């Protein structure tokens, strides 16, 4: 499935690489909004796909962050 940004924010940490295998609940990246950090976690087991976001990049609410493939 596709994981989208839950809010407008700034990408501050990318914790995995594109193509990396992740487990459900594993932190994938961290967004910052209004001085608060929000950890975006993998919603299921799978391989991260399409992770193109870079540290320092602004994201809009609902923008695709990455997808998970079996």
UniProtKB/Swiss-Prot annotation:
It is found in: Plastid, Chloroplast. Pathway: Lipid metabolism; fatty acid biosynthesis. One of its GO terms (biological process) is fatty acid biosynthetic process. Residues 1-69 form the Biotinyl-binding domain. The modification N6-biotinyllysine is found at residue 35. One of its GO terms (cellular component) is chloroplast. Pfam families: Biotin_lipoyl. Keywords: Biotin, Chloroplast, Fatty acid biosynthesis, Fatty acid metabolism, Lipid biosynthesis, Lipid metabolism, Plastid. Its main location: plastid. This protein is a component of the acetyl coenzyme A carboxylase complex; first, biotin carboxylase catalyzes the carboxylation of the carrier protein and then the transcarboxylase transfers the carboxyl group to form malonyl-CoA. This is Biotin carboxyl carrier protein of acetyl-CoA carboxylase. It comes from Solanum lycopersicum.
